[in-house]
Amino acid sequence: MAKKKVFISYDYDNDKHYKNLLLAWDANKEFDFSLYDQSVDVSVDSTDAGAIKRVISARINNSTYFLCIVGKHTHKSGWVAWEINKAVELKKKMVAVKTAKDNQSPSELFGIGAEWALSFTFESIKSAIERA
C-alpha cells in the first residue's frame, strides 16, 4: 500500500498523544495502515507567526489528506482553525475525528465536506481516510 501523505492538525498542548498513536499504528506491521506524516512536531507559540505559517502551509500543500484530531480544547485553537482554512484553500481531502463524542468541533470543519471517523479507532480513521 502506498503511503498516504497526511497533514495531522491537532492541539499540540493537549492532544499530541493521539497524533503519536496514529504514528504508532503506521509503524506497526500488524496494522494495515500507511501514513506519511506531514504535521509540524513543535508547539507554534512563537513571535514569528508568518514564518510558522509558511512552514505549515508548505506541509499542508505537500499533503493529499488533512486529518483534524478534535480533542476537548481543539475548538479554541486559532492555529487549528487557520490550518483547516488553509487546507480548504489548498483543496485537500478533509478528514476529522473526535477523541470523545462530546468534544466541540471547530466551526471551520462544518460545511466543507469533511469525512468523519466515528471513533478514534484504527478502523474508523482508516475508513474515513479511504472515503475522503
Q: What is the predicted role of each segment?
A:
Residues 115-123:
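Short acidic-hydrophobic, aromatic-tinged amphipathic segments that line or gate anion-handling sites
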Residues 102-115:
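Glycine-rich, charge-decorated loop segments at or immediately adjacent to ligand/cofactor-binding or catalytic sites
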Residues 1-62, 131-132:
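Conserved N-terminal substructure of TIR/SEFIR domains
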Residues 72-89:
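Conserved TIR/SEFIR loop-to-helix hotspot centered on a Trp-containing motif
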Residues 27-31, 86-94:
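Arginine/glycine-rich "motif VI" loop of SF2 helicases in the C-terminal RecA-like domain
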Residues 94-104:
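Short beta-alpha junction loops
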